[in-house]
Amino acid sequence: MELEYPEDLRYLETHEYVRLEGEIATLGISAFAVDQLGDIVFLELPELGEALKVGSSFGTIESVKAVEDLYPPVSGTVVDRNQAMIDSPELIADDPHGEGWLLKVRVENPDTALADTLSASEYRTQVAGES
């Protein structure tokens, strides 16, 4: 099965994604990350109001295979957490780019926030080399 990477998302080399709408960014992990992790069993996310900084881990995701740090594609303040995914992290695999989102963040600089992210095409090229 070929994995899909929506064109309206931007990606990090560490397999997180961001969808920016105005100054609110929705963060999650890519279908490739879900595929590589396997069965997800635990998710640790920051609390509402916590500040995220590009390059600094904001949480962890644990599967039967591995524990991975999560990195934000943008800097900002957490304004929403997907409690359903915290309670049942295995559901992330059902729709990682949609209902399986992890956080919503109010972005510090929306105009330049996506400068260090990859387009879907660039990301597809990257993961093709990893699989």
Curated annotation (Swiss-Prot):
PROSITE patterns the UniProt entry points to: BIOTINYL_LIPOYL (PS50968), LIPOYL (PS00189)
Keyword Glycoprotein in annotation: no
GO annotation, biological process: glycine decarboxylation via glycine cleavage system
Primary role: The glycine cleavage system catalyzes the degradation of glycine. The H protein shuttles the methylamine group of glycine from the P protein to the T protein.
Gene name of this polypeptide: gcvH
Family note: Belongs to the GcvH family.
This protein's name: Glycine cleavage system H protein
Residues with PTM N6-lipoyllysine: K65
Organism lineage string: Bacteria, Bacillati, Cyanobacteriota, Cyanophyceae, Oscillatoriophycideae
